[in-house]
Amino acid sequence: MPTVNVIGAGLAGSEAAWQIAQAGVDVNLYEMRPVKMTPAHHTSNFAELVCTNSLRANQITNAVGLLKEEMRQLHSIIIQSADATAVPAGGALAVDREPFSELVTQKLTSNSHIHVVNEELSAFPDGITVVATGPLTAPGLAQAIVDLNGEAGLSFFDAAAPILDANTINEDIVYKKSRYDRGEAAYLNCPMTKDEFLAFYQALVSAEVAEGHDFEKMTVFEGCMPIEVMAKRGIKTMLFGPLKPVGLEDPRTGKEPYAVVQLRQDNAAASLYNMVGFQTHLKWGEQKRVFRLIPGLENVQIVRYGVMHRNTFMKSPVVLEPTYASKRRPDLFFAGQMTGVEGYVESAASGLIAGINATRMALGETPVIFPETTAMGSMAHYITHTSAHHFQPMNANFGIMPALTVKIRNKKERNQQLADRALKDLATFQAGMNRVEQV
């Protein structure tokens, strides 16, 4: 039986390696860290979370929550590890980031079918291979991808939010509450009056950004847009985004503030909080000056400043099959953000599919296409069937899944039925895969 190569031990690569090893197939898992680090990573652990610590919604009536549940049914290492290291986050699944990546690393390195190779590759190995090197792919391998695909792909930028020392947050001003009181009161909320918001807005739009990037020429994915870029779109833009006050009444007044900045718990000890939606590329001194204008953060200590990364992705509609296999080299699979899926969970899900299909190829079976009615299948279908000319990264969402045969006006009820259909179709599909494996 051939050994499968997996390049990159991020979320997608870790998931792919796990799926392959669980089937009893040997894996060479290549990870260049710590021999060579990237600008975004801080450790040598696998599946390190370089942006937020949130894996977003957990309810199946939300598309990313459904995606997680599908992955649970398929024994995802990423979702198993996230559930095991979860921290309070209302209706979302957020993790204590270091224990999370440490758990993934421990599970993979202790698996007898996985051989870890700490080495930077500049070419594709021979044989069945999953490439999951992420948005910060090293130049040599990036060139190999360009040479294979005949096109350079696209680039965009995303950003990480600051992380704060909880002991320096003013508890006399902030209050604990989740939006609409969903789940436990997991977020700290910094309320703003109109005057406080306007003063903050003016400081934000006039603050200096770090050198090295021309914001006017950037293609920035909406889900990770720097707060200062969002603010420059209009004075009220943030009020409909991360500073939206709806459902966050101040329990001391019973009234809804003009604006609210939310802080999400970042570790199990609750000693760190991150600023929700505050990805930024401001200079570090400016971050301290501007963010201390937020009520409750007057004396806050920033333990990790917001940073910005350059990300790259391929024109998947041109170069990939919905199995995540290359159209030009069928034994070469791609997974993760480089395929145009956007988000932690989406990246891991693509690795799960690529891992299953690499396994099937190693076992002499045909790669499978997941049902489009599932969250996993709809992502694979979208990135390989949408317009290549206008291709942009995509999060999991119900809008890319086939509509129900019956029109339902109530959004929550409609989403519930879409989720029920997805899980039923996944179970049928999974049973069919298992029958093939047993023959």
Swiss-Prot record:
Molecular-function GO terms, alphabetical: flavin adenine dinucleotide binding; tRNA (uracil(54)-C5)-methyltransferase activity, 5,10-methylenetetrahydrofolate-dependent
Top EC class for this record: transferase
Keyword match GTP-binding: no
Biological process terms in GO annotation: tRNA methylation; tRNA wobble uridine modification
Keywords (A to Z) from UniProt: Cytoplasm, FAD, Flavoprotein, Methyltransferase, NAD, NADP, Transferase, tRNA processing
Catalysed reactions, semicolon-separated: uridine(54) in tRNA + (6R)-5,10-methylene-5,6,7,8-tetrahydrofolate + NADH + H(+) = 5-methyluridine(54) in tRNA + (6S)-5,6,7,8-tetrahydrofolate + NAD(+); uridine(54) in tRNA + (6R)-5,10-methylene-5,6,7,8-tetrahydrofolate + NADPH + H(+) = 5-methyluridine(54) in tRNA + (6S)-5,6,7,8-tetrahydrofolate + NADP(+)
Location (main, coarse): cytoplasm
Stored Pfam families: GIDA (PF01134)
Entry's localization field: Cytoplasm
Keyword Flavoprotein: yes
Identification of the protein by name: Methylenetetrahydrofolate--tRNA-(uracil-5-)-methyltransferase TrmFO
